[in-house]
Amino acid sequence: MGNRCARTSCCRKLWSCICCCSNNNNNSYGQTRSQHGSKGKVHPVSRIEKWEEKITEANNHGKILVVNFSAPWCVPCKKIEPVFRDLASRYPSMIFVTVDVEELAEFSNEWNVEATPTVVFLKDGRQMDKLVGAETSELQKKTAAAADLFLRKP
């Protein structure tokens, strides 16, 4: 519960407080940050036109699109942000974007985003995997698995 924030505005402050006070010891933030200090290319998406540009780019080049649905007030979102950047650096064959759920609320609802952060993995515009919450080790595993699938493509 402390690794994700509810998206409803009435619960936002309560969730932020709960998330901020949680202590999750099964993340590798410090390890990832120290091993990979460079910033990866994460494309911010706050307009539907930018989304369409990135999904078209991924589809045209046969790349996996990794989408981080995030909110500026979400403490767990801030926790995974450096890990997400690091993954973008490590996996240049994938496209990493962060969608601002406040700027694109209706769009986020279409993707069934009920809490932040939610990370969705897309191939050819279709969801292949999803992670809800700031479980950094799980995010790393799912990203590595998606990259492995990309490398095995026919």
Swiss-Prot record:
Presence of keyword Protease: no
Domain of life, source organism: Eukaryota
Active site: 74 (nucleophile), 77 (nucleophile)
CDD domains linked to this entry: TRX_family (cd02947)
Coiled-coil spans in chain: none
Keyword Electron transport: yes
Domain Thioredoxin, first and last residues per copy: 24-148
Major subcellular location class: cytoplasm
UniProt xrefs under Gene3D superfamilies: Glutaredoxin (3.40.30.10)
Location in or out of the cell: Cytoplasm
Any single Gene Ontology cellular-component annotation: cytoplasm
Pfam families in the record: Thioredoxin
Record's signal peptide: none
Disulfide pattern: 74-77
Function: Probable thiol-disulfide oxidoreductase that may be involved in the redox regulation of a number of cytosolic enzymes.
Family per similarity comment: Belongs to the thioredoxin family.
Protein name from the UniProt record: Putative thioredoxin H10
Species classification: Eukaryota, Viridiplantae, Streptophyta, Embryophyta, Tracheophyta
